[in-house]
Amino acid sequence: MSSSTESLPGTLRRTLTTSRAPAATSSQRLKAGYFVSNAFLPRVKANGIHDSASSQRSTTVASTTSTTADAADGSSSTTQPTTAADLPPVDNTLLPHRRRQAQRKAAAAAAAAAANGETPTPLINPDAPTADLAPDASSQLAAAAASAPADSLKRRLSSLLSLSKPRLTVLVVLSAMVPYALYPVPSFLTSSALDTSLAPSLSPLTLLFLTTGTTLCSASANALNMLYEPDTDSKMTRTRTRPLVRRLLTTKAAVLFAVGCGLAGTLALYFGVNPTVSFLGAANIALYAGAYTPLKRISAVNTWVGAIVGGIPPLMGWAAAAGESATGDGTWRELLFASDGSSLGGWLFAGLLFAWQFPHFMPLSWGIRHEYKAAGLRMLAWTNPARNGRVALRYSLAFIPLCVGLSATGVTEWSFAVTSLPVNAWLVWEAIKFWRLEGHKGSARGLFWASVWHLPVIMVLALAQKKGMWGRVWRSVFGEPEEEEGEWVYEDEDEEEGGGVGEVVKGVVKK
């Protein structure tokens, strides 16, 4: 019996042997590969390596042949042949199909660059978290500015707006607005029937000054960051299109924009909110531009300093709301360190944003760790990869007690501690995979996208379960009183007893 017959399953082999059927044609012959064997995955891996090697050899042969033909035709082009060695390196830890995809993209990019006489640019790791991300808002605005006429208003405005990192600024402003809305004001939807001063409510004007001032402070910090490191930005794929790298703006214009936004933002917070919030806004600029940015070249501790910067905006929102209902002199001690513990909610929100920076940034930096290293920026992703995963896991676990703390301090209902648990568990699970696999096999991508969705979901859950909000909504809709109160009546008493002076008691007015 032939070897091809021996490779078939036992039942089919016995049938073919006993029936003595004539040999099957090539179109009818069953192959052993039709039946999935236990060695399927090893064969796929081996085939992937073989295909990659074959594609590299074919690329080398094709480019060499093309170069030889050009030389024979007397071409004057000085373009060097594109070989596998000339292509950007591809991470060997990727899955086979990812590796082949990266090789094809690298070959196509190298061929296009060679045709245009340019130097091939390194490709982003296709397994990195940033592989599926669209260009950020700064890059899009810089591209729009570059396409506009040199002296046009569109070019100048787009370039200046690009300095502010719009998406990051929006996140900063939202992280200040949520604690402002969640501050436990005594009356959220209704005002006091007796004296509105006894039941303070959130002021739309204060919220306007808070958002405007925070936006300007964030824009100032981001512009100063770009002013400090245009040389390192030019070495990284995700930052090489920034306006100062592309010389869309002069350094003088960027300095004026940064200083102007910083002054306007702190003044708006000082006069429109309170001095404590203004100080926090100025401190945020100083820490981000004066400490975090220079530390990136010195130590991986820069990540912790950057996380502190991320935790300040929630404190700003909380202090802004606390200033409206302050019963004392409204100093920073009362707003941030109240003796009755009412400021704990603000610090818990600051802790949430501080902890969130690590499961978000660690997988993001892992995908471009080689670029960080080439640019001279010290990140745990390449200085200590094992610790990089441990840090992401450690701060992912911190979300569980922080969410419970918000319920325990009366900021949210206890249902928030329950509903936030599945979201926090999802983040922890992705962080465990990122730690165990050290970023490989898609674990970095999984944790990055989990962190992207995690924070807004937690914020929405907290807003939807603010302490006492739904009870007040119910009473406001159905007209039920907030508490049982006695009727206000007048009782006449003798002048000898009451002296003719009206005396107010709870539920009763004596006259």
From Swiss-Prot:
Predominant place of localization: mitochondrion
The organelle targeting sequence, given as a residue range: 1-23
Location of the protein in the cell: Mitochondrion membrane
Gene3D superfamilies assigned to the protein according to its UniProt record, in alphabetical order: UbiA prenyltransferase
Low complexity compositional bias, start-end: 52-79, 104-115, 126-136
InterPro entries the UniProt entry points to: Protohaem_IX_farnesylTrfase, Protohaem_IX_farnesylTrfase_mt, UbiA_prenyltransferase, UbiA_prenylTrfase_CS, UbiA_sf
Any one biological process term the GO annotation gives: heme A biosynthetic process
Protein purpose: Converts protoheme IX and farnesyl diphosphate to heme O.
Protein's UniProt name: Protoheme IX farnesyltransferase, mitochondrial
Source species of the chain: Neurospora crassa (strain ATCC 24698 / 74-OR23-1A / CBS 708.71 / DSM 1257 / FGSC 987)
